[in-house]
C-alpha cells in the first residue's frame, strides 16, 4: 500500500512565526479552523497535535506543535504536510466531493468519449488548477471551474474545452 493511500492532505506548514516555535499553517479545510477538529497525521501516519494560537488576515493559522519550542525547530517544518485519514471524514453530499477524490478520474468530452485522466490538482493561491493527461500523453493545466468542468461525478469529469483552439 502506498504510504499516502487513504490520506487526505488538509494543510501544510508555510513558515515559522516569531521566536517561540510557532508556525503558519495553510489549511485546506473550509473554514480553515476546521482542520483542528480532525485527527491529524503525518506522511508516516504518526499522530500530530497542533494548538491554535491565532488566525492572520490571510486566513492562515498561527499554531504550535507541542514538542516545538524554538524558531530553529519551527524553521525545519517549512513544507511539512499534514493529513487526515480518509475514513475519518464524513461522506460528501451528493453534489459535493473531496478534491483528492478527483485524482486519476477519467476525463470525458461533452460526447462522453474518454479523452484522458486527471493527473494532479494544484493550487498556487489563485484557485484550483487541474492537470489533465490526455490519451496522447500530453498534459494541460486548466482552471477548476464549472465553465471547464460542467459535470463532476465520483466516476468521471466532463471537460468542456477544445484543445488547440
Curated annotation (Swiss-Prot):
Keyword Cytoplasm: yes
Superkingdom of origin: Bacteria
Coiled-coil segments: none
Record carries keyword Hydrolase: no
GO BP: ribosomal small subunit biogenesis; rRNA processing
Molecular function via GO: ribosome binding
Predominant location: cytoplasm
Record-linked InterPro entries: PRC-brl_dom (IPR027275), PRC_barrel-like_sf (IPR011033), RimM (IPR011961), RimM_N (IPR002676), RimM_N_sf (IPR036976), Transl_B-barrel_sf (IPR009000)
Keyword vocabulary terms for this entry: Chaperone, Cytoplasm, Ribosome biogenesis, rRNA processing
Quaternary state and interactors: Binds ribosomal protein uS19.
Full protein name: Ribosome maturation factor RimM
Gene: rimM
Amino acid at each position: 500500500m502506498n504510504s499516502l493511500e487513504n490520506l487526505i492532505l488538509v494543510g501544510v506548514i508555510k513558515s515559522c512565526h516569531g521566536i517561540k516555535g510557532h508556525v503558519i499553517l495553510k489549511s485546506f479545510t473550509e473554514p480553515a479552523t476546521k482542520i483542528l477538529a480532525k485527527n491529524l497525521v503525518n506522511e508516516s501516519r504518526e499522530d500530530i497535535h497542533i494548538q491554535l494560537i491565532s488566525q492572520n488576515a490571510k486566513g492562515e493559522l498561527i499554531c504550535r506543535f507541542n514538542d516545538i519550542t524554538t524558531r530553529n525547530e519551527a524553521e525545519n517544518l517549512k513544507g511539512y504536510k499534514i493529513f487526515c485519514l480518509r475514513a475519518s471524514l464524513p461522506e460528501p453530499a451528493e453534489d459535493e466531493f473531496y478534491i483528492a477524490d478527483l485524482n486519476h478520474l477519467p476525463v470525458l468530452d461533452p460526447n462522453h468519449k474518454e479523452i484522458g485522466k486527471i493527473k494532479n490538482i494544484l493550487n498556487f493561491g489563485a484557485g484550483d488548477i487541474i492537470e489533465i493527461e490526455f490519451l496522447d500523453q500530453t498534459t494541460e493545466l486548466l482552471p477548476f471551474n464549472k465553465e471547464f468542468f460542467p459535470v463532476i461525478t465520483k466516476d468521471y469529469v466532463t471537460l468542456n474545452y477544445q484543445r488547440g483552439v
